Amino acid sequence: MTLPLHPLDPDLFARALPLLADEWLTRDPELAPVLPTVLARNVGQDWHKAGTFRHHLVGVTRTLTVWQQPRDVRLLGLLHSVYGNAFVDLVKFDPAKERARVREIAGESAEHLVYLFCTQSRTQFVQKVLAHALEADGSLVLQKDGQDHVLTPYEVAAFIIVSMADTIEQWFSWQDDIFSRFPDVQHRNQKAHWAASLWPGPMRPSGRMVHQINGLAKALQHPGLKDVLPMPPVFAHCTQHLSAANEAAATSLYWSVIQQDQPLVDL
C-alpha cells in the first residue's frame, strides 16, 4: 500500500525558511533586544537534553514564531526556564531578586507569564489539561502550597502552546526512559537504575510523547480557549486525534527501517 505524501502548506513553508538561518533571532525586532541579556547568562554553556540550553530556548522560540504566536508568548518560549523549574536546575535569573530586570528587558506581560510558567507545577498543569479539568471559561485551577491558584484562559492557552513547542523540540527515547509515564512519573532508585539514564541512549524517536502533545493540542479546542491565541498548524490545526497505539506503531515502523543495514536502493 502506498500512502500519499502529506501536502506542504506553502505559507507555512515560506514562514519557516528564514528561520533556518543561524542569525534569524538577531534580526527579529521583538526578540533581538532581549537576546544579549539572555546570552550573557551563559545559556550557551549549559547542556540540555540534545544540545545546549541556548539551542533549546532558540528552538522553542523558532517553533512559536512559525506558529505566529504574539510577542509575549514567543518571549515566554525564549525565557521559559530562566527562573528554573522542577524539571531542570538552570536558574539564570533569581526570581526573588531579578524579576524587575526581566520585566525591563521583556515587558510586564511576558515576565508575568515566565514567572508563572517557572513557579507553578507544570506536571500538575499537564495532568489537569489532559484530564479535561478546565473550567467552563477555559481557566484552570492549580494547587500550590495548599492554596488554589487560578490561571486565566490566556495563561492556559499560552502554557499549552509553549508546552507543546517545548516538548517536541527536545523529546526523544532517552526522555521516554528517564521520564517514563510522564506526567505520572514514578520515582526510581538512582543507584539501581543508573544504566537506564545513560545519555543519549539509542536515540530513537519518542514512542509516546507526540500522542500526549496531541492531547494538549486538542485542549485548545475548548470553547474558552479556541480563539484566544493563533491555533498551532499541527494535527490539522489541533483538531485531529492521534492515538497512543498509532504513534507507537509509526515509531516502530520508522525505527525498523532506520536499523536496516543496507540502504533502500538497488546495489
Please annotate each region the language model reported.
Residues T2, H6-L57, S252-L253:
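N- or domain-start disorder-to-order transition segments that initiate the globular core
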Residues P10-F13, L31, E155, M209, ...:
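Short amphipathic alpha-helical segments that mediate assembly, nucleic-acid/protein binding
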Residues A40-W47, V60-M203, M209-L216:
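Divalent metal-dependent catalytic cores for phosphoryl transfer on phosphate-bearing substrates
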Residues G51, H149, A244-A248:
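Short helix-capping and inter-helix turn/linker motifs at the boundaries of alpha-helical repeat units
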Residues L229-L242:
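Repeat-mediated protein-protein interaction surfaces in helical alpha-solenoids
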Residues A245-P263, L267:
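Amphipathic alpha-helical repeat scaffolds of TPR domains
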